[in-house]
Amino acid sequence: VFTATAPDDSVSSMHIEELVARMPEVGRNLVTVYRRLRDATEELEAYRSHATTETSLPAERPMPFEEVRDFFYDRNNYIGELDIAAERMFAQSGMTVGGLDVQLSALMHERFGVRVVIDADLPAHAKRSYDPETKVLRIAQWLLLGQRAFQIATQLALVSQPELLSAIVATDDQLTPESRGVARIGLANYFAGAFLLPYREFHSAAAELHYDIDLLARRFEVGFETVCHRLSTLQRPQLRGVPFIFVRTDKAGNISKRQSATAFHFSRVGGSCPLWVVHDAFAQPGRIVTQVAQMPDGRSYFWLAKTTAPEGQGYLGQHKSFAIGLGCDLMHADKLVYSTGITLDDPSTAVPIGAGCKICNRSACAQRAFPYLGGRVAVNENTGSGLPYSPVTEVV
């Protein structure tokens, strides 16, 4: 399952999924084994990188944000008890879609004694500031209405669900103390998304609109990124949506956000694949670009990507630029409006991509930036090739 080059009699992904469904404990053990293999691979790369520099550096451990990403990945990016709690509070509080920033401000004051103030004097990049002593929540004036609602809903999670947040974090005894703090914020953000986009209503709208992100954003008064992230969480048993992979990357290929309800693998070393359509979005800012891509394991995915609109920080201010990517297994692509007019059943049209050059075994890739980690590059001074670091002849 985990080898770089699968033999002809390798177990199919369908069989693996069936095994996990029938025996969840086996599935968890497979995930654990795979994670250990991945960590060992990345540790080897770290040792190689340090071999020519400092030899006294302490052993690296996963960063808190990496641990929290694994925390959500292990749960298929769906936190059932928190999702249901947000949906229940939305309904019991008489909330309706539209103008949620105003409705949430009233809810915070009436139910929790928290006064929400729209503040123009917060630090330049601050979005939210809460004082537990005075129970005043300050929200940055420059935020859009949907962004204001999200920040208020995040604080709502922290003041209304502290025990639930702690209980969910406590289910993972592998988290470090620092990671636990990051996980609480991540769970509060999850609650906020689930509150603004209540599961059943949003799930129904997504199917009705064929997952048209712009139309969903307009209906629920939130941004493109918020809709994409919420779509990646629609994995409630008996009411699942399309299992999406959600990513956010910058022009240099650094992935700052990644969540997956699928088996799609992201590399932590050597950057992401330059052939991946998410990088093409920067060449067409504001437009949605699509791609049918195939991974080295043979699985094919449908991807769409779009750049985010920069926040108004003034002409001399520092502007953030990201591309949002949303992908799913090719078998689900026909449910998406973005697959209209695209050939989905011809494998020859799929773009061969990988998780990252250092862990990708495609020896015939002309775009390769690094040699395959653990492989040997054949060097023959009597020949020349247009393929960098080729061929990978064996794995050691």
Q: What positions do the PLM features span?
A:
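Short juxta-domain linker segments that transition from a proline/glycine-rich
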Residues: 1-396
